[in-house]
Amino acid sequence: MPELTHFDAAGQAHMVDVGGKQETKRIAVARGSIRMLPETFALIRDGNAKKGDVIGIARIAAIQGSKRTADLIPLCHPLALTRVKVDFELDETLPGVHCTVQVETLGRTGVEMEALTAVQVGLLTVYDMCKAVDRGMTITDVKVLEKHGGKSGDWVAG
C-alpha cells in the first residue's frame, strides 16, 4: 500500500512540498448524483422551482466550489485552474440529477479534490434550491472517474 503523503515522519499533518515537481497538464473528472421525489424532479425539469434556474445556479456554484477548494480542504494547494467544465444530466428514472465535472490545470499537483468539491457544491446547491419541497433528497455516488497527468500518470475508475 502506498504511504500517506500528508503526514511527516512524526505523524504530523503537513502540506506536501510540490516545488520540485514538473508542471504538467492535470485533468480530473468526478461525478455524483442527487435523488429526489418525482415532483421535485418535475419542478427542476420544467423550470418551475421557486428559487429560479436550479441547474444554472448549481453550475455556477460548482465552478465557484472548484476555485475555493484550498479554502475548504486544509492541506490542498491553491491552484490556478485553466478549465472547469460542469455538466448536469436530468434522469427521470432516478429520479434526480447527475453532475459531472472536469477540472484542468497546468501545475505540479492533481485536481481531483477540485473536481470532487465542484460536484459536491453543485449538488448541495440543487438541494438548497429545492429543500423547501423535498427535504429527503440524497446526494450519492460522488467519486473520481478519471485523472490524467503527473508522475502517477493516467487512472480510470474500473
Swiss-Prot record:
Pathway(s) served: Cofactor biosynthesis; molybdopterin biosynthesis
Catalyses which reaction(s): (8S)-3',8-cyclo-7,8-dihydroguanosine 5'-triphosphate = cyclic pyranopterin phosphate + diphosphate
InterPro entries linked: MoaC, MoaC_bact/euk, MoaC_sf, MoCo_biosynth_MoaA/MoaC, Mopterin_CF_biosynth-C_dom
Record GO terms (molecular function): cyclic pyranopterin monophosphate synthase activity
Stored Gene3D superfamilies: Molybdopterin cofactor biosynthesis C (MoaC) domain
Family: Belongs to the MoaC family.
Official protein name in the record: Cyclic pyranopterin monophosphate synthase
Species of origin: Paraburkholderia xenovorans (strain LB400)
Lineage, highest ranks first: Bacteria, Pseudomonadati, Pseudomonadota, Betaproteobacteria, Burkholderiales
